[in-house]
Design a protein with these regions (language model features):
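Structure-specific nucleic-acid interaction/processing domains
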Residues: 1-142
Length: 142
């Protein structure tokens, strides 16, 4: 088993559970503040080796992955990984289905506009698709 594992349907998710899946959509939750991050990760990376024409398939760093958000990474560094739970929300067989489901959930969960009781953002996510930004939404309201 690996440190602070991913959970899927109340069970620890391991390599043998990957089967034919290409990637997953996940939620990382800060147990101290309840702040969340929704993202996606692929199980595989495809790289062209020097001097080769074909791409080779390699397992990605999905077991160690904690998202790409700088604010989330900073909180993990400050509080420690043990204060964050990692849940796989859905598994997908293609890159396109993985990306679509991530985007759908980001909008459905209102990650750019949802606030905690204290008025701070409920999600670490600060943008969707690099096109829609939390800061733009709140500027619009003021």
């Amino acid at each position: 088993m690996y440190d602070n594992p991913w959970w899927y349907q109340d069970e620890i998710f391991n390599e043998e559970d990957i089967n034919g899946y290409y990637g997953f959509v996940y939620c990382i939750t800060n147990s101290t503040t309840s702040k969340k991050y929704i993202g996606r990760k692929y199980f595989w990376s495809f790289r062209k080796k020097k001097g080769h024409k074909r791409k080779s398939k390699q397992e990605s760093d999905w077991k160690k992955y904690y998202g790409s958000c700088p604010e989330l990474k900073e909180d993990i560094k400050k509080l420690g990984k043990e204060h964050f739970s990692r849940e796989i929300l859905s598994l997908h067989t293609t890159l396109g289905k993985t990306n679509y489901e991530e985007t759908r959930l980001l909008f459905n969960h209102n990650v750019l506009t949802e606030s905690s009781v204290d008025g701070t953002p409920a999600y670490y996510n600060s943008n969707i698709l690099g096109r829609y930004y939390r800061k733009d939404y709140f500027q619009y309201l003021s």
